[in-house]
């Protein structure tokens, strides 16, 4: 492999603020923020919007979208007039 062309693969903390969930894993993502982890070491921090702790599919708190009501409303508004 060529030298100095591959991104650094290092430990990184991903933080989901909506669920107050942090996970230490490895990644090549670039970030300027850092955080002190439970082991006392400082790691790069990546803030994410959704994780397995906050996504409706994984939490079981899915919202059912009322598409039937939307379709009926669309047909009333734009449908053919008899």
UniProtKB/Swiss-Prot annotation:
Entry superkingdom: Bacteria
Keyword Lipid biosynthesis: no
Pfam families in alphabetical order: Ribosomal_L31
UniProt KW Ribonucleoprotein keyword: yes
Stretch forming the signal peptide: none
Molecular-function GO term, any one: structural constituent of ribosome
Keywords linked to the UniProt accession: Ribonucleoprotein, Ribosomal protein
Gene3D superfamilies named in the record: Ribosomal protein L31 (4.10.830.30)
A biological process from GO: translation
GO CC list: ribonucleoprotein complex; ribosome
NCBIfam families for this protein: L31 (TIGR00105), PRK01678.1 (NF002462)
PANTHER family: 50S RIBOSOMAL PROTEIN L31, CHLOROPLASTIC (PTHR33280), LARGE RIBOSOMAL SUBUNIT PROTEIN BL31C (PTHR33280:SF1)
Subunit structure: Part of the 50S ribosomal subunit.
Entry similarity comment: Belongs to the bacterial ribosomal protein bL31 family. Type B subfamily.
Protein name: Large ribosomal subunit protein bL31B
Source organism per UniProt: Dichelobacter nodosus (strain VCS1703A)
């Amino acid at each position: 492999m060529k030298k100095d062309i591959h991104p650094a693969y290092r430990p990184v903390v991903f933080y989901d603020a909506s669920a107050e969930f942090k996970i230490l894993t490895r990644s090549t993502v670039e970030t300027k923020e850092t955080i002190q982890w439970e082991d006392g070491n400082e790691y790069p921090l990546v803030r994410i919007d959704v994780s397995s702790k906050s996504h409706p599919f994984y939490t079981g708190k899915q919202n059912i979208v009322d598409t039937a009501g939307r379709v009926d409303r669309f047909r009333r508004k734009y449908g053919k007039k008899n």
